[in-house]
Amino acid sequence: MSHIEKQAGELQEKLIAVNRVSKTVKGGRIFSFTALTVVGDGNGRVGFGYGKAREVPAAIQKAMEKARRAMINVALNNGTLQHPVKGAHTGSRVFMQPASEGTGIIAGGAMRAVLEVAGVHNVLAKAYGSTNPINVVRATIAALEDMKSPEMVAAKRGKSVEEILGK
């Protein structure tokens, strides 16, 4: 159900899920739609958005706009992760680890969409617990945010990168 489109700013946009929700009022039910989207530049920047409106296109547009505003930077290492990372949000837990060149993105559903637009090309990933797309996306982005490059760790500790890597 996800599709990619390139935009003028070279952001990749992916629609992960559209859901019909209802509000019950005295006169019956009022239906509206929610949309979950992710955007990324394919080079370490990624964000997600959740939009809600009475019509599907309006919900998607709101979600895309929120995603563009909420982008984070991810420190990638040659198209893969720096080190194994875990992330969690409510009942969803995700585990991702770097993979060698040629492995591809081994991940399911919502997690795959986030990793693709972030610019990760080789990764092994698994979602545990709830696979609700919103929670999986939040957990994946939390894990990517927690990932630190050796340069960041070295700067924080006041050491050289070689000391951190044990070379």
Curated annotation (Swiss-Prot):
GO terms for biological process: translation. It comes from the Bacteria. PROSITE patterns: RIBOSOMAL_S5, S5_DSRBD. Residues 11-74 form the S5 DRBM domain. InterPro entries: Ribosomal_Su5_D2-typ_SF, Ribosomal_uS5, Ribosomal_uS5_bac-type, Ribosomal_uS5_C, Ribosomal_uS5_N, Ribosomal_uS5_N_CS, Ribsml_uS5_D2-typ_fold_subgr. Keywords: Ribonucleoprotein, Ribosomal protein, RNA-binding, rRNA-binding. GO terms for cellular component: cytosolic small ribosomal subunit. One of its GO terms (molecular function) is structural constituent of ribosome. The keyword rRNA-binding applies. With S4 and S12 plays an important role in translational accuracy. Located at the back of the 30S subunit body where it stabilizes the conformation of the head with respect to the body. The N-terminal domain interacts with the head of the 30S subunit; the C-terminal domain interacts with the body and contacts protein S4. The interaction surface between S4 and S5 is involved in control of translational fidelity. PANTHER family: MITOCHONDRIAL RIBOSOMAL PROTEIN S5. Belongs to the universal ribosomal protein uS5 family. Part of the 30S ribosomal subunit. Contacts proteins S4 and S8. This is Small ribosomal subunit protein uS5. It comes from Yersinia pestis. The lineage of its organism: Bacteria, Pseudomonadati, Pseudomonadota, Gammaproteobacteria, Enterobacterales.
